[in-house]
Regions:
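Phosphate-group recognition and catalysis centered on beta-loop-alpha active-site segments
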Residues: 2-275
Length: 275
């Protein structure tokens, strides 16, 4: 056991060094490249998810980013959604449109029609997509289905009572690969589980704590954790031994991918590692 823990500790040290020293460079130089394919990383089974679509080559949380993820052959595309003032679920990460769009204002205070008057004007490859508009949850699902790519839907806004409207949208479709819901908010996770006992849900956290594992067990969810927190690597087996599915975000370096796969973490979200 001590030898195993020592090996894990060495892995953690590698992770910490990589995340602290190399992250700055790679997050600036974000273009996906064939040298970041997984062939050299590991032979273990795992599933790659494109973070906010393939956001290294197209604007995050946009239709082109999902299209590029589908063309690249990702297992799943992760994207963020929140409801507008009039209840339309749109694909965007921030509470406001300010960072990624031509307008200003909070999503919850803007109608869908008002947001459609704006364009997405920020992100990788934006010069290739003039007049790019925001997409709805329905439109995002259409693209995922087109490529037989699983939809990983992160709820970024809305209240517990809004979760039914998401399930209503999903319930109108027959999926080749069932979508899954991910969320940092305990109340929304609990509400979603109460409404649907079968849909796959992952509770997102920075740190895997005792109460994280208990909450996941009580609500029959997986756990999505931050790869850059060293202590998480010592909790992986605790969670797995209790039947909890684990996923890690956001992994952009092959040595880290190799460590996670060695620890049997099968679901990996990335900005730039190609399938």
């Amino acid at each position: 056991m001590k030898k195993i823990l020592l090996r894990i500790a060495k892995f953690v040290l590698i992770v910490a060094v990589i995340s602290a020293v190399a992250a700055g460079y790679f997050m600036i130089n974000t273009t996906a490249s064939s040298k970041f394919t997984v062939a050299s990383a590991t032979e273990n089974e795992f599933y790659l998810t494109a973070h906010r679509g393939l956001s290294s080559v197209a604007p995050e949380n946009s239709a082109p980013a999902l299209e590029e993820a589908g063309k690249a052959g990702y297992y799943a595309a992760e994207f963020d959604v929140m409801p507008t003032k009039d209840g339309v679920w749109v694909m965007i990460h921030d509470d406001t449109v300010d960072r990624t769009m031509s307008g200003t204002g909070e999503i919850c205070n803007l109608t869908y029609a008002e947001i459609l008057e704006m364009t997405i004007d920020e992100g990788n490859g934006i010069e290739n997509y003039p007049d790019l508009k925001i997409s709805t949850l329905d439109e995002a699902l259409d693209i995922c289905e087109k490529y037989s790519m699983r939809a990983m839907i992160e709820i970024k806004g809305g209240k517990s009572e809004d979760m039914k409207s998401v399930l209503d949208i999903l319930g109108k479709r027959a999926f080749e690969k069932e979508p899954l819901i991910i969320d940092f908010d305990k109340d929304r996770v609990s509400a979603m589980r109460e409404l649907d006992k079968n849909i796959e849900i992952w509770y997102l956290v920075n740190k895997i704590e005792d109460d994280t594992i208990e909450f996941a067990k009580e609500n029959s969810t997986g756990i999505g954790f931050n790869f850059g927190i060293p202590k998480n690597y010592f909790r992986i087996k605790d969670a797995q031994s209790q039947g909890i599915t684990l996923a890690s975000w956001t992994v952009d370096f092959l040595p880290v991918l190799d460590v996670l796969c060695a620890l049997d973490v099968k679901y990996i979200t990335t900005n730039r590692i190609l399938p």
